[in-house]
Amino acid sequence: SSFATNPKRDELITNVKNLIDKPLSDPRKHARAIHNIQGQWQLLDTSSKSASKSQWLNFNELTNKAWESCKEYFEEMKEIKINNARERHKIIEEINNYVMENQKKWPSSKVLVLYLKKMYEKWQNFAPVLDKDLNNLKTLYFASRKPINDAITKQEKINKENKELLILKVNEINDDDNKICIDKFNELKNQWQKIGNAGRKYDNALWSKFNKSADRFFIEKKQAIA
């Protein structure tokens, strides 16, 4: 069995030598190719007799040499990832400061939504980060956004309730003069425009319901003209 695996190990050694002589132009593909060869070598260790010491030392030395061509790339990538983490910490700090400055009197939900969108785009610019930093940064980032998201939810709930009240008021319009009914509806429409967003889930549906509630006035107007 050990004799049968020797040619396979020799083949893997040849493959590593080829990578040293002709490194792949994409450092990530080059790294994956080395990983793949190392994986095959380990598979031979588990399925048959281990390599001889000299064969293992030769393979190990060659794989280390094969790494050289993409080492610089990975070192550069590591620096970029470390810097990205620094920048992301700054963004978290920036959001925390925004919360401190605004939590006594929050801007409108529209302003807050745009602010979070802007910060998210900024956050996305600083990817990737090191695996060891990823979860901690995510936790801190979501924690910093939470007070703003809570403020948006609270405002949208109030806006939803106010819009529902206006729909009820439209339903209550019941004047004999249809023109007065339309004037009253337009007055409520002006009030509606001043209310902020009720949230993506409800806003369009509420607007549609609001207008449908007034359809009866405009149908009557059309009939009067006809």
PLM region spans:
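Coiled-coil/CHCH-like alpha-helical segments characteristic
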Residues: 1-226
